[in-house]
Amino acid sequence: MKVFITGGTGLVGSAVVAELVAAGHTVTALSRSVSSAERAEAAGVTPLRGSLTDLEVLRAGAERAEGVIHLAFGNDFSSPEAIARDVTEEAEALAALAGPLIGTGRPLVTVAGTPVAPGRASTEEDPLPTEGPVGGRSESVARVLALAPRGVRAAAVRLPRTVHHDGRGGFAGLLTEHARRTGVARNTRAAGRRGAAAPP
């Protein structure tokens, strides 16, 4: 299968790419920098230069693919405005990726987070939160899933709140880096609260 992936050189994406290549799929990865393109090539995939704001590049990548996986996100959490910008950027990118797939029966896979369920462990049946700084991401996922009746094999994989690799990446990576820098490891879990963490 010919697969187009965004975020293919990121933490989760690099693990997904490795699985796709090992299974014999032909992969094209959106690459926003020279170093990202080099990492894509080293992983055995074809880089397609562009970013999530290059909507024509995204459409072209999706048009040529037999399936699309969207994993990229801006990850600028420096301010509410930056987060809002990243959420809007992702919504527009997903719309661009979805357009060429409508009516084709080809898959579009994206990711969603794990919601908080007060007093119990959450499940995949729990609704995604649409409130808060990244609530718009849940709305984007809902729009992707709503494409199923329009001939898109739409899916959203729910990732745990923390995805990490060797102490790098995600919230666990931030905590690990802080502990390495300061010599102090913090426990951010309130009494009785549980959370999921997993490697990619």
Where are these regions (language model features)?
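N-terminal Rossmann NAD(P)H-binding glycine-rich loop of SDR-like oxidoreductase domains
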Residues: 3-25
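Rossmann-fold scaffold of SDR-type NAD(P)-dependent oxidoreductases
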Residues: 6, 66-71, 110-111
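Conserved Rossmann-fold NAD(P)-dependent oxidoreductase catalytic core, especially the SDR/UDP-sugar
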Residues: 26, 74, 80-81, 87-134, ...
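NAD(P)H-binding glycine-rich loop region in Rossmannoid oxidoreductase-like domains
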Residues: 31-92
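Active-site segment of SDR-like NAD(P)-dependent oxidoreductases
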Residues: 75, 113-117, 160-163, 182
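Glycine/proline-rich active-site loop of Rossmann-fold NAD(P)-dependent oxidoreductases
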Residues: 138, 164-174
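Conserved beta-loop-beta element that borders a ligand/cofactor-binding pocket
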Residues: 143-166
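A conserved pocket-lining segment of Rossmann-fold NAD(P)-dependent short-chain dehydrogenase/reductase
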Residues: 177-198
